[in-house]
Amino acid sequence: MIEVIDGQRQLKACKRIVVKIGSSLLTANGQGLDLDAISHWAMQIADLHNAGHEIILVSSGAVAEGMVRMKLTSRPTDLPSLQACAAIGQMGLIHTWSSVLEKHTIQTAQVLLTHDDLADRRRYLNSCDALQNLIEWRVIPVINENDTVSTDEIRFGDNDTLAAMVAGQVHADLLIILTDQQGMFDSDPRSNPNAKLLTTVNAMDDALFEMAGGGGVLGRGGMVTKVRAARLAAKSGCPTLIASGESDHVLSRLMSGELLGTLFSTDKDRITAHQQWLAAHLQTAGRLVIDAGAVEAIKQRHRSLLPVGVKAVEGHFNRGDVVECVDQSGQRVAVGRVNFSSRSAEIIKGLASDKVHQVLGEARSLEMIHRNHMAIY
């Protein structure tokens, strides 16, 4: 009961909110954009906007709209066709959002991003500045992944993850992911009729992945992906709420303090802007496999990664590149800027600090990755 009350207070106190709306809530059973549904969303968004909330909208639906415009009955599987559908459908998607929000005297702006945009330091900072200006001007950014120029992101990426990255970028108070599911259950409700809806969970609880299920046809983000997104947002100190967009006036009810769906809470402090940029790297130049002692030192004691804790070096990278650190089961532990090239890292892996000096000389850094240049998962 205390957790529910705390969750209600937490929701009511949120000012800057990233709202992600999935394809199934914006399309008419996959038959293109549903103008009535989008108009209804616009009304709720306008209510929050007029109440003083700062809304950043992450909207899916471009590929589904493109399919209808090209009279396709099934989602293409080849990359060029998917990219073409996204390009065609994005025209309709942004026009629809602009039109319905303009009726509420709200100005919108289209922002198309890829993971590469967020991984490049300069482009990341530029997009941060642009989003900040839009928010200050009381303009609602309508953000989507730039599927037309994406490569593997269009097959493996998703707007849940993009929304979590944006939440970190803009220092959001809350990420809301609206879907066709009620929230997070303790088991898959499609196979277990006795599955229970979880009201509040800790975003960093590893057990959540065991409870998550799959996704729908037009959308790409199943519950596993949403849990990962909630964890990514949590690293920036941002809680996530996953709720059913099919509930009446769900946004208005949530922001009035009604706790619907599942709140993924976080006890983590906000990480620095540099660490947020590091955390945005879903793809890295290489990776370091580290032992249990190094995992404990990084996650529990917030220490730097030393060569002695590195068991294996994978990929080709240069000094200053961003690499990921994984445990010996392959689970990502952290990402960070490495102080050695892959060639040097291979030479010094597993060596104690005094041995590193003997091999590479006194002038070189002792840390494989310094804690100030690391984002922990």
From Swiss-Prot:
Location relative to the cell: Cytoplasm
UniProt-listed Gene3D superfamilies: Acetylglutamate kinase-like, PUA domain
UniProt GO BP: L-proline biosynthetic process
Residues at which substrate binds: S60, D147, N159
Matches recorded under PROSITE patterns: GLUTAMATE_5_KINASE, PUA
EC number(s) given by UniProt: 2.7.2.11
Coiled-coil segments on the chain, per record: none
Primary localization: cytoplasm
Cellular component GO terms, alphabetical: cytosol
Positions annotated to bind ATP: K20, T179, D180
Annotated catalysed reactions: L-glutamate + ATP = L-glutamyl 5-phosphate + ADP
TM helices/strands, residue ranges: none
Family listed: Belongs to the glutamate 5-kinase family.
HAMAP family, per the entry: ProB (MF_00456)
Protein name: Glutamate 5-kinase
Upper taxonomic lineage: Bacteria, Pseudomonadati, Pseudomonadota, Gammaproteobacteria, Moraxellales
Primary gene name: proB
